[in-house]
Amino acid sequence: MAQNFTKLNPQFENIIFEHDDNQMILNFGPQHPSSHGQLRLILELEGEKIIKATPEIGYLHRGCEKLGENMTYNEYMPTTDRLDYTSSTSNNYAYAHAVETLLNLEIPRRAQVIRTILLELNRMISHIFFISVHALDVGAMSVFLYAFKTREYGLDLMEDYCGARLTHNAIRIGGVPLDLPPNWLEGLKKFLGEMRECKKLIQGLLDKNRIWRMRLENVGVVTPKMAQSWGMSGIMLRGSGIAYDIRKEEPYELYKELDFDVPVGNYGDSYDRYCLYMLEIDESIRIIEQLIPMYAKTDTPIMAQNPHYISAPKEDIMTQNYALMQHFVLVAQGMRPPVGEVYAPTESPKGELGFFIHSEGEPYPHRLKIRAPSFYHIGALSDILVGQYLADAVTVIGSTNAVFGEVDR
């Protein structure tokens, strides 16, 4: 039987190959530098304009969800670092928050203060990282150098607290592993000053830069309807003009006690999204400045008290036989949450990050599902890129701030 060579399956199954001097099909990635070997876009072009974009993912798939169903609840925590690896503390917290909701644990106030500080510090580090590499993609190399210098100070603080700079593993189910080191808050105050100065410097380089604005304004426009239909969240959603932040709508930890604003865009373009990242850095500084005096007013416990699910403090394990046996059982066999299911959303630097956990009362989740914001934002490229010039594709992809560790799970 004669074969039909007008189609190539599966990637090109929806493309009709008809001769047109003005149209062509271009594979953007995975070798392209801006895709980091993790994204392939099949672009249909008419001249220099994109008329169709088909994202293809899966190049970084590691089976993170299935791993979670074959590990005990505590064993899985370090794996969450490898989702959005530019803001790993947010992943740690989102997973811990879901398990704690399932277990109905009460978290000590000091642990809540430390967690919220770490989350906002992590948000600033992630935002300044995005701004620096986005500027580098567009061609502003100086911003990359200045921003990375300031980011290093933030990573030093994370290293002083948990010993790691990238994959922090700084949160535990039930609290935090460590109290803040001596003089750590003084270093944090100094970092906030450094961040303010860095932000002013970057704004001086970019805000009124004619080339920067020409490359970003009216490029990659996301309308409110498009944002809602694709399930966008975070700055991708707020940039379109919709004021939705889970820290305000469904507050967790201490956010309901804190005074902060939710910046919202007007035009939904790449420049709006850049501006929102800068404004959110201000809000994170504002939040941390409210949390620092709260720390001194809290008591010393940093882990929840529940022998069925949480190990006793280390000093008790070393001196009390019952605490040692309970710790051995939790480590060797794992905790056994009650039968049920839970979905707990959080506001990560990229958007809504949530974990769905279905428990059958066993040491392993029966089903674990990760709702990662970058997955939805990459899918939306098939709408956002249509009508854009090929030269603007890198700008649009960069403005989504997608990390493929959480896209390919």
Curated annotation (Swiss-Prot):
Membrane topology note: Peripheral membrane protein
Xref: Gene3D superfamilies: Cytochrome-c3 Hydrogenase, chain B (1.10.645.10)
Keyword presence, Repeat: no
Primary localization: membrane
GO molecular function: NAD binding; NADH:ubiquinone reductase (non-electrogenic) activity; quinone binding
Enzyme Commission (EC) number: 7.1.1.-
Subunit-structure text: NDH-1 is composed of 14 different subunits. Subunits NuoB, C, D, E, F, and G constitute the peripheral sector of the complex.
PANTHER family: NADH DEHYDROGENASE [UBIQUINONE] IRON-SULFUR PROTEIN 2, MITOCHONDRIAL, NADH-UBIQUINONE OXIDOREDUCTASE 49 KDA SUBUNIT
Official protein name in the record: NADH-quinone oxidoreductase subunit D
